[in-house]
Amino acid sequence: MGNKVIALVIGVILLTGRAGWCDDKLNIAVSHPWLVLLVSFIGGTEVNVIPVRVWNANGDVVVADRGRVLRELEEGTKAVALDEDDAKEAGLMGTRKNFAVRCLYSPFPLSINALPDPSVMPFVAQRVLTALSEWDAMNYPNYQRRLAEFQARMSSSVLVGQVLKDSTVCDMSGASGVMLQAAGCRVIRPEELERWEKGNFAGLREYLDNNRNQEITTMIDDDTPAVLKRYLSGRSDIYKWERPPLDRDYPTFLQEQYISLWQKIVTKPLPGMNRKR
């Protein structure tokens, strides 16, 4: 009886090519933090994601662990990149090691800053599904289910963001304005922003004080130039749109950001908290 069970187990492994109960996950190196979030969600428990690049404390994209992760990748490791340029920037193409890189686009038709756009992410997620399914056809139903869940939850998060509809927000972010548009905010972008981003702050204090008097919240993010972020630090009427941690569920994180911004807008700052040099 025991020999028959062993033979059956071996037969199943040979037929499927993978022993799911042996924690045989699909190892995939990923080129960019935004893609890490997508591959992690769509892959679920079937995929072990290896981030080649991450966000540092300032929100900049940097090589993970000072390049150690990339150096330790084995020849032939499966990898996902947005396009060839993204793969080369991540060190997954054009190096001495040959990785099995799957580029999702040729090339990606938008700026990399468009990736977090709620109207863009679900389409990129579909390409992630295709890549994972080519490597692991057996788990296609799982990946398809996760894609459907991702699309539904992103839509749900944007619906939560509708609490901000018609709220006026001054956008001084580098790449997060699309989140405001998706939520139906009235977005204003100052004409002098390019000059302020270069450190010429003439008129900025008066502009911010005027916004504050009109109860208009100003939003920045990690892509806002550092010189401008430093100037704005400490003001209670500034909201910073954060980068998601790579181990977070992105639709939930997006929903939390919308709620946090709404709380910022409806909470009036205490008198005297916006004094600035």
Regions found by a protein language model. Give the residues of each.
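Bacterial N-terminal signal peptides
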Residues: 4-17
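Extracytoplasmic metal-acquisition and chelation regions
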Residues: 22-277
